């Protein structure tokens, strides 16, 4: 046992006490460098080789890659180091102070998902790493909660090809082998303002948007009829019209109207295909009102993800846990890390706690998670 390292709870406390919020708003966004440096020190103390990787086009964000052992294959344990911002008015405790009450560990990132690294490091202190005959990798990424820039950059730049990767997102220790993607778009209509007493002298953007929404709802129905995957509780792609704003006064012809929509494609649907379907749906509007319709990404799109049920990784994890791998509707970094090697999502904590005030992880997960991590390392690195 490595006695130089802090205790499990002390590791957890230090992680939660180190803010690493990612946000599109620059006023809220924070570098994760302090957290990455903290992890680097602990992993180095365990004897792993550590590399800090600056992530391009971010606000001073870093990935960390640590490894023990050389050669082909092996296991990668992955997680993100950032959290969402917090609503101070809805939290009843300090989000950056780990507190324990009623068998729960409270704090921002306890479940989603900085706490994972406390589990990994605490498990590694009891592993005889010199007995591993395949490499073990620990990947800590940046900006999962916004652009997924860390995972995108790692997948695009690494030459590593482990046998498999486990992303420790909070899944209540149930294996996840597939999830939908995410496309978030802004539809903007530019009209021509004027006095409401003479409608013919203007172009009402709200009226054009009304017609555009009709075409979007037709597309939504088409997606439901054309695509189907029974692995999902909601087995078709979804579209949500989530936000709309237009105009500034009742007596003024609306000059601009903007709609924000969310689409969740199934695995196997390419983002290019989905964009093409969206553009085709709005082609009649664009043709009738030349130059007045624009479509923009609100966030970088995320493709769907699936690790086939017959994949050796899925078979091994299902046998290890005695549970079938499932499909979910939320997104993770899996589609990007799947480009590197077969990937599953499996970790402690409940997804119901993600992005919630007074976020917590039940202490019931502590022993099973340590056991699972030990089993994973022995299975994939000592074969």
Swiss-Prot record:
Keyword set, alphabetical order: Amino-acid biosynthesis, Arginine biosynthesis, Cobalt, Cytoplasm, Hydrolase, Metal-binding, Zinc
Cofactors required: Zn(2+); Co(2+); glutathione
Keyword Amino-acid biosynthesis belongs to the record: yes
Signal peptide boundaries: none
Annotated Gene Ontology cellular component terms: cytoplasm
Pathway involvement of the protein, from the record: Amino-acid biosynthesis; L-arginine biosynthesis; L-ornithine from N(2)-acetyl-L-ornithine (linear): step 1/1
Binding site for Zn(2+) 2: 112, 145, 355
Cellular compartment(s): Cytoplasm
One Gene Ontology term from the biological process aspect of the record: L-arginine biosynthetic process
Gene3D superfamilies in the record: 3.30.70.360, Zn peptidases (3.40.630.10)
Molecular function in Gene Ontology: acetylornithine deacetylase activity; zinc ion binding
Family to which the UniProt record says this protein belongs: Belongs to the peptidase M20A family. ArgE subfamily.
Record function comment: Catalyzes the hydrolysis of the amide bond of N(2)-acetylated L-amino acids. Cleaves the acetyl group from N-acetyl-L-ornithine to form L-ornithine, an intermediate in L-arginine biosynthesis pathway, and a branchpoint in the synthesis of polyamines.
UniProt protein name: Acetylornithine deacetylase
Organism: Edwardsiella ictaluri (strain 93-146)
């Amino acid at each position: 046992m490595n006695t130089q390292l802090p205790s499990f709870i002390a590791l957890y406390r230090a992680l939660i006490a180190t803010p690493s919020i990612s946000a599109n708003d620059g006023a809220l966004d924070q570098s994760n460098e302090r957290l990455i440096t903290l992890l680097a020190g602990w992993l180095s103390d365990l004897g792993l080789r550590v590399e800090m990787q600056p992530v391009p086009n971010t606000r001073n964000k870093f990935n960390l890659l640590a490894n023990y052992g050389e050669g082909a294959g092996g296991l990668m344990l992955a997680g993100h180091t950032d959290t969402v911002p917090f609503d101070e008015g809805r939290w009843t405790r300090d989000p950056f102070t780990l507190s324990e009450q009623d068998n729960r560990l409270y704090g921002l990132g306890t479940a989603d998902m900085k706490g994972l690294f406390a589990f990994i490091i605490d498990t590694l202190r009891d592993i005889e790493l010199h007995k591993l005959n395949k490499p073990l990798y620990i990947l800590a990424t940046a900006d999962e909660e916004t652009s997924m820039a860390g995972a995108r950059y790692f997948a695009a730049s690494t030459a590593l090809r482990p046998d498999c990767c486990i992303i420790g997102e909070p899944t209540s220790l149930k294996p996840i082998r597939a999830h939908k993607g995410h496309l978030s778009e802004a539809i903007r209509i530019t009209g021509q303002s004027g006095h409401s007493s003479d409608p013919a002298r203007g172009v009402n953007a709200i009226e054009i948007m009304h017609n555009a929404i009709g075409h979007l709802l037709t597309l939504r129905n088409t997606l439901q009829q054309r695509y189907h995957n029974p692995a999902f509780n909601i087995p078709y792609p979804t579209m949500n019209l989530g936000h709309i704003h237009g105009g500034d006064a009742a007596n003024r012809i609306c000059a601009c109207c903007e709609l924000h929509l969310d689409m969740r494609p199934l695995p196997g649907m390419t983002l290019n295909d989905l964009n093409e379907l969206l553009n085709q749906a709005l082609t009649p509007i664009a043709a009738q009102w030349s130059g007045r319709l624009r479509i923009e990404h609100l966030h970088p799109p995320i493709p769907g993800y699936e690790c086939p049920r017959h994949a050796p990784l899925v078979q091994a994890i299902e046998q290890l846990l005695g549970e079938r791998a499932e499909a979910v509707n939320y997104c993770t970094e899996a589609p990007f890390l799947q480009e590197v090697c077969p990937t599953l999502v499996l970790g402690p904590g409940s997804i119901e706690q993600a992005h919630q005030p007074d976020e917590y992880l039940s202490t019931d997960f502590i022993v099973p998670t340590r056991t699972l991590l030990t089993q994973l390392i022995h299975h994939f690195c000592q074969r």
